[in-house]
């Protein structure tokens, strides 16, 4: 489940019309959401609040062998007025990311009026509106500031600076600083990661630099098909999308070189929609070739190749129904002949509310029958709130993941009253993660076999619960 600050950053991207999915780093996001989800560790409590449309806070308290926590603050120059912040109102599908339907590429919005990086920082000029009145123009570009302090020592500070330079460019600066041991006089270790993103809808480029080993990087993604910046007059809906991308890294300090390339084929929403029966003859002729569904179920295929290490990975994700999705991944290394196979699924469940009483029954009909009174027109009861919101409040999702070594991971995420709860467990002969508490719990078992596991190892790798509340 996404943290509250990650959810606010996602809302910031939507408010500024920035497509985060049109990036090579999100090429396999669908399979990762279904196969690489993490389970909570022990007990963790999150308290968050969007105090104003521009300012948000979040506090975390957890027990992972010892008491730890974090304090996080976020400021946005873009007002997030339409962003639900209460944990009882946030759509669970925005927090529990599952199957991600790829959307058709769109052209960037060009009406922001941005000219340069520092243009308009302190300006308070006004521009005329349609009715002749003057409205204050955007004096500052869309900017987001986020800082998180992790406690107790060794204290770690994570900071993020996000700024929209132009409708097609975005600058991101991330800082990580860790304080040394209390008795150490050395300076805190710090690293800076800068990223400049350029997205035109048709293609995207990302340029990265990290002070850690002076690492330079580039990522690019190309979408085949028509350019959304030059739309046709009567375009037919696109049924599928083929994207190709690559990334490359180089460090002159450590002589580190890395690269990978990948392909993604995904059906678009129009591929599973039946053409309208009320369309005219001419439109029917047009849609006979372009509007016919090519698939009953939305699916996504990816292929990623890392030439230097000889790794090949393929994924196949399928949404069998609006509440059920499957995914699988197969990896192979041509140098070591090692392989990996992972399968997973997610199941969404909605607990329907009981149907409201009939309109002509005011709840007193039983009393009238007892008193043998004549039927009188009933007073229509107050209309109950929308059942759509209630369904959203009672949503829950169950995720299951298993690999070829029979390591099983279970995760349940749902809403209990006004709380967002995540509960997970890991089972298998080997641990999913190298967390310290899992290693300590295994060592504390005295080398006994538990649950049929291998001698000297524990089959039960841990269970955790995370509780979140936001206002």
From Swiss-Prot:
Places the protein is found: Mitochondrion outer membrane
Bias kind Gly residues: ranges: 444-455
The keyword Nucleotidyltransferase belongs to this UniProt entry's keyword annotation: no
GO cellular component terms listed in the entry, alphabetical order: ERMES complex; SAM complex
Keyword Transmembrane attributed: yes
Pfam family, one: MDM10
Region (Disordered): 272-291, 374-394, 436-455
Key words, A-Z: Membrane, Mitochondrion, Mitochondrion outer membrane, Transmembrane, Transmembrane beta strand
Biological-process GO terms, alphabetical: establishment of mitochondrion localization; mitochondrial genome maintenance; mitochondrial outer membrane translocase complex assembly; mitochondrion-endoplasmic reticulum membrane tethering; phospholipid transport; protein insertion into mitochondrial outer membrane
Membrane topology term: Multi-pass membrane protein
Amino acid composition bias (Low complexity), ranges on this chain: 276-288
Job of this protein: Component of the ERMES/MDM complex, which serves as a molecular tether to connect the endoplasmic reticulum and mitochondria. Components of this complex are involved in the control of mitochondrial shape and protein biogenesis and may function in phospholipid exchange. mdm10 is involved in the late assembly steps of the general translocase of the mitochondrial outer membrane (TOM complex). Functions in the tom40-specific route of the assembly of outer membrane beta-barrel proteins, including the association of tom40 with the receptor tom22 and small TOM proteins.
PANTHER family found in the cross-reference section: MITOCHONDRIAL DISTRIBUTION AND MORPHOLOGY PROTEIN 10
Family of the protein in this entry: Belongs to the MDM10 family.
Assembly with partners or alone: Component of the ER-mitochondria encounter structure (ERMES) or MDM complex, composed of mmm1, mdm10, mdm12 and mdm34. Associates with the mitochondrial outer membrane sorting assembly machinery SAM(core) complex.
Domain notes: Lacks alpha-helical transmembrane segments, suggesting that it resides in the membrane via beta-sheet conformations similar to those predicted for other outer membrane proteins and porin.
Protein name: Mitochondrial distribution and morphology protein 10
Native species: Neosartorya fischeri (strain ATCC 1020 / DSM 3700 / CBS 544.65 / FGSC A1164 / JCM 1740 / NRRL 181 / WB 181) (Aspergillus fischerianus)
Gene that this sequence comes from: mdmB
